[in-house]
């Protein structure tokens, strides 16, 4: 166990050094101080100090959390730049790939070192959800930009399909980390609507956005990639909001999109009715799926 801990500490330290160098490059290119880069750099400096202590005494969970928070801030700065520039066609593909790689590193690190059979114990559900959300949301924004480029779609719809499948996979993964709260006499809630949301696996506004984003990506896949040969891209297609369902199957854009958007509309017009979440786009997509099926 001590050897495994020491290995993780060394690897986190190496990754932290690489990230710090990357932040330095970003800061120099930006020509001004940025809140997110400053915060990311501070987290990595703290990480460096902790890694300098006795490695056997280091808490890998704390180190990994610091590294993950730094990566989330660093990549957020770069994502904002991509969005502001509307994902430049000549460089965005490589940049998106690079950001996905950064955001995947914490999970990869834990899995490679087999620190715990349930690696979420090291990162925690909220950080795992955030990593999946950020990857899925990044691909959603990128695909949204690509769907407006008619010539690009004619040439590279197969590439769009790959981005969509990956993005949907990350968003469904995010929705499936936590199990819904089972309603019973031993659990008390302040109001019935909150109870309904938690029992549906809706723990935050981000969970709702993830449902809408994945449903919209399924729509793009069905609209722009329908003529392509199906791929054996297996995804956990359950949308219960829980990690309890672990079966995987090839993703069917229409089927998954219908399932998740029906739940989205039900939640928005049910327990969240007073908050006036917009369901117009979701209903239009469901209507598209209905006519496409018939």
UniProtKB/Swiss-Prot annotation:
Interacts with the MON1A-CCZ1B complex. Interacts with GDP-bound RAB7A and promotes its interaction with the MON1A-CCZ1B complex. Signal peptide: none annotated. The modification N-acetylalanine is found at residue 2. This is RAB7A-interacting MON1-CCZ1 complex subunit 1. It comes from Homo sapiens. Its main location: cytoplasm. Plays an important role in the removal of damaged mitochondria via mitophagy by controlling the stability and localization of RAB7A. Required for the recruitment of RAB7A and ATG9A vesicles to damaged mitochondria and promotes the stability of RAB7A by inhibiting its proteasomal degradation during mitophagy. PANTHER family: RAB7A-INTERACTING MON1-CCZ1 COMPLEX SUBUNIT 1, UPF0600 PROTEIN C5ORF51.
């Amino acid at each position: 166990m001590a050897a495994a801990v020491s290995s993780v500490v060394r690897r986190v330290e190496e990754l932290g050094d690489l990230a710090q160098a990357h932040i330095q490059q970003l800061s120099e290119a930006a020509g001004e101080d940025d809140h997110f880069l400053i915060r990311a750099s501070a987290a990595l400096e703290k990480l460096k100090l902790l890694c300098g202590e006795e490695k056997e005494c280091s808490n890998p969970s704390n180190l990994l959390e610091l590294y993950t928070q730094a990566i989330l801030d660093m990549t957020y700065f770069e994502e904002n730049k991509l969005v502001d520039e509307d994902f430049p066609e000549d460089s965005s593909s490589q940049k998106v790939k690079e950001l996905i790689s950064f955001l995947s590193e914490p999970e990869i690190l834990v899995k490679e070192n087999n620190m715990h059979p349930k690696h979420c114990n090291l990162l925690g559900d909220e950080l795992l959800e955030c990593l999946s959300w950020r990857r899925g949301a990044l691909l959603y924004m990128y695909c949204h930009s690509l769907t407006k480029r008619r010539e690009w779609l004619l040439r590279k719809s197969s590439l769009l399909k790959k981005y969509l499948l990956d993005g949907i996979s990350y968003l469904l993964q995010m929705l499936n980390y936590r199990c819904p709260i089972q309603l019973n006499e031993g659990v008390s809630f302040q109001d019935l609507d909150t109870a309904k949301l938690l029992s549906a696996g809706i723990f935050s506004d981000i969970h709702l956005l993830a449902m809408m984003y994945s449903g919209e990506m399924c729509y793009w896949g069905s609209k722009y990639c329908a003529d392509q040969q199906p791929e054996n891209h297996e995804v956990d297609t359950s949308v219960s909001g829980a990690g309890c369902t672990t079966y995987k199957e090839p993703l069917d854009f229409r089927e998954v999109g219908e399932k998740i958007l029906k739940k989205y509309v039900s939640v928005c017009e049910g327990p969240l009715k007073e908050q006036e979440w917009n369901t117009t786009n979701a209903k239009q997509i469901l209507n598209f799926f209905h006519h496409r099926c018939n």
